[in-house]
A protein has these predicted regions:
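Short Lys/Arg-enriched alpha/beta "domain-start" segment
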Residues: 1-35, 70, 77-132
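Surface-exposed peri-terminal alpha-helical interaction modules
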Residues: 3, 9-21, 146-147, 201-205, ...
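N-terminal domain-start signal
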Residues: 16-61
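Domain-length accessory/inserted modules outside core catalytic folds
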Residues: 100-111, 139-140, 178-181, 194
Length: 223
């Protein structure tokens, strides 16, 4: 189920891209009928139909509302050049040429909701990350690497607050992310990922009982 819809030009671009190029992207498969694709994002699966201009979650929570930003992110992934293998080099957004200029002010990494939700609850953050298929890392007080797409990991490093410093979260990326996405989509990727991380833990949130990771896939493709 969608909310606000992507602009028609996003769909036009996707319809114009050769189908074999789209299907070469990790985590993307063809559905047996029509021209739709199945795309994995974290532990969920989505139908993306460029002919009907429709995106739906098929598993585990088909009734999940999908933001405009999320829908654009999926389409832009399907339009992205193949960024190749992971380099294994972790970098911050400001390590990219021009990153220090772009990723500030309104484009600072949108991680504040994670800080508010988990700044004093590191183990709850770990538990939530594991629900989404994340891997624990040995950085900060706790850190988790999420795989929104198979070859585009995002690592959240959480430092719990103390008497001297407030809690904080930073993001790290494999250097190859810049071969997949421009800066605006790296920002959108973190925005969407942050929303998904805090989603289940939001006060008063209503979650579908099927939203338990039943669609979790092994998407750790490194070639």
């Amino acid at each position: 189920m969608g909310c606000a819809q992507p602009h028609p030009f996003h769909w036009e671009d996707l319809r114009a891209r050769p189908r074999e190029e789209v299907l070469s992207l990790p985590g993307v498969t063809a559905l047996p009928e029509g021209a739709a694709y199945q795309v994995g994002f974290l532990n969920a699966l989505y139908l993306v139909d460029p002919q009907e201009e429709r995106i739906e979650e098929t598993s585990p929570w088909p009734r999940r509302p999908l933001s405009k930003e999320f829908q654009i992110l999926l389409i832009r992934y399907l339009l992205a050049p193949h960024g190749g293998k992971l380099t294994g080099e972790l970098v911050s957004e400001k390590d990219f040429p021009g990153g220090s200029t772009f990723f500030q002010g309104p484009h600072a990494m949108p991680v504040d909701p994670v800080v508010r939700r988990y700044g004093a609850a590191a183990q709850a953050f770990v538990a939530r990350g594991l629900e989404l298929g994340a891997e624990q890392m040995a950085l900060g007080d706790v850190s988790l690497t999420f795989y929104p797409f198979p070859l585009i990991p995002v690592t959240y490093v959480l430092w719990e607050g103390d008497e001297e410093f407030p809690p904080s979260v930073t993001c790290l990326f494999d250097r190859s992310v810049s071969k997949w996405f421009e800066f605006d989509m790296i920002f959108t990727l973190v925005l969407v990922l942050t929303e998904r991380i805090v989603e289940a833990g939001a006060a008063g949130a209503t979650t579908d009982p099927r939203h338990t990771g039943g669609a979790k896939q092994s998407q750790r493709e490194h070639s």
